A protein has these predicted regions:
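Membrane-inserting effector segments that mediate pore formation, membrane fusion
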Residues: 2-58
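Non-transmembrane, amphipathic alpha-helical segments
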Residues: 9, 16, 20, 39, ...
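Residues that form generic nucleotide/phosphate-binding pockets
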Residues: 24, 57, 64, 105, ...
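Long, helix-rich, hydrophobic modules that act as membrane-proximal anchors or helical bundle/coiled-coil regulators
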Residues: 100-230
Length: 230
């Protein structure tokens, strides 16, 4: 399906010209500093990593569905738009969860996931608004008990116990302990976006309630679009 994209990312004549411009500008500290920010090698590295991540995802998909299923992607305008939007966002973030979500959005578009084009466009741009923590919380609340099972841990919800949503959150993400105010802020934001059906982390509930899925139908669609699907 593709040659090794790493070879295509070797420096071009344009890259060499830019290097020359930066060399000339080095005698003017302010200009040199500005160019370092805009055209720095970390940004090039970020671009290369994103393109390789996307190419590897498409190659994995090709092996799953076959060459013929993907041969029309180059003419698929919806796919092109999603990839362009995702690429623009990927260049502005270093957060791995966001870049993975963007890549999955592209791959799921190529797989013709059953979500309307308008929703796909909204969902990709929504990734740009959300934080790494937001995405983690959404993935957890899609199905808390399943998330624990994936970690090899079984939660017994038949016993007696009470608590709030943070009981499960902090058990699954212990690194979030002590961040009650920020976690509450992010959940409230996800609720305002229509992705979660619960606004407060302070409501006391049973064990069943603590580990219930908490996404709205829109939230479920969003997660299905941005996660890796078999």
């Amino acid at each position: 399906m593709r040659t090794d994209i790493r070879k295509d990312l070797e420096p071009t004549s344009g890259d060499l010209v830019m290097a020359g411009v930066k060399g000339l500008a080095s005698t003017v500290p302010f200009v040199a500093e500005l160019l370092d920010v805009v055209f720095s090698s970390p940004l090039e590295k970020r671009k290369e990593e994103w393109l390789i991540q996307l190419a590897d995802g498409l190659e994995k998909l090709r092996k799953q569905v076959g060459e013929q299923k993907l041969e029309n992607l180059a003419d698929n305008e919806e796919f092109q738009t999603i990839v362009l939007d995702a690429t623009n966002i990927a260049m502005r973030t270093h957060q791995e969860a966001k870049r993975k979500a963007l890549c999955n959005a592209c791959i799921n578009t190529a797989k013709e996931i059953d979500i309307s084009e308008d929703k796909k466009l909204v969902f990709v741009r929504l990734i740009d608004q959300l934080t790494d923590m937001d995405l983690k919380l959404l993935l957890y609340f899609e199905n808390p008990l399943k998330r624990f099972e994936e970690k090899g841990e079984t939660i017994n919800t038949s016993g007696f116990g009470m608590g709030g949503l943070t009981t499960g959150i902090y058990r699954y993400y212990p690194e979030l302990k002590g961040q009650d105010e920020f976690v509450a802020n992010r959940i409230k934001n996800l609720y305002s976006l229509g992705l979660m059906n619960t606004e407060s982390i302070n409501t006391v509930m049973t064990l069943n309630g603590i580990y219930e899925p908490r996404l709205t139908d829109l939230g479920v669609e969003f997660i299905s679009f941005i996660k890796e699907n078999a």
